Amino acid sequence: SLDPKYKTTYNSFVQNISDKKITLDILTFNYTDTIENIADQLEAHPEYADKIVVENIYHIHQQLNELGIILGVNDENQIQNKSLSFHPDIKATMIKPYINSEYVSGTDNECKQAIDRANMVILFGVSLGATDRMWWNYLGEHVAAYPQRIIYCPYEEDTSALDMSEVIIRNNGLITRCANNMYLANNAYSAVTPKIYPIRANRMFNFGLTHNVEANHSKVIAQLTTKINATI
C-alpha cells in the first residue's frame, strides 16, 4: 500500500483523470507467456470490472517462439572485450536495442508510445538493471517532463512493521534507487523524484499460481546457448 504522504498526492493526481475507462498497456521484459497466464486467471474487482481494459501486452525482448528471444546488454560499453564490442555480428547477437532496431519489429517504438500516452506507470517485478538502461532513462526523462506518475512496487522479503522514521528512510532509499537507475541529468532527476510513489508491504507478487519455472528456464538457456554457438 501507499504510505499517507504518497496516498494523498496520488489521490490528488488521479482526480484529474477520467475514471470512465482505465486502459492498461503492459510492457513485459519476460520471455514467457507468464503475464498472459496471470491475466487469464485473475478476476477483476467487481467495482472496476467494466472499466478496466487490457489494451496491449508488449514483450520488449520478444518471446519464446520461432523468432527467438533477445538476450544481451544495453549498449557496446557493457561488453568488456572492446575489440569485439562494435563488430556488427556481435552487436546483432548481444546489443538488445540494436537487434530490435535492425530487425524492425516495431516493438521499441510501440513501447515508447505506450509510455508517452500513460498517465501512470507501474514498475512491478523489474530489477532496474543496467542491461535495460535505455528503458529506465526513457521513462525517467518522459515522466520528468510531463504530468505522469510512477508507482514503484519493489520486491521485499522483509515485510515486518516499521516505525515512522524507518518508513521515511526506506521510502527515500527506494525513490533514490529508482531515480539513480534512470541516469538522468540533474534537472530531470530533481523533477522525477517527487513523482515516484513507492509501495510498501505489497502482496502483488503472491499470485497463488503454479508455473513450470524449470521448463521456461531451460528454454531460455537453450536459446542463449544456440545464439552463442552460432557466433563462435
Predicted regions: what they are:
Residues 1-103:
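Extended, H/D-rich, highly charged conserved domains that either
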Residues 8, 106, 134:
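Short, conserved clusters of charged catalytic residues that mark active-site
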Residues 109-232:
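SIR2/sirtuin-family catalytic core signature
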Residues 103-109:
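Active-site-adjacent structural elements in folded domains
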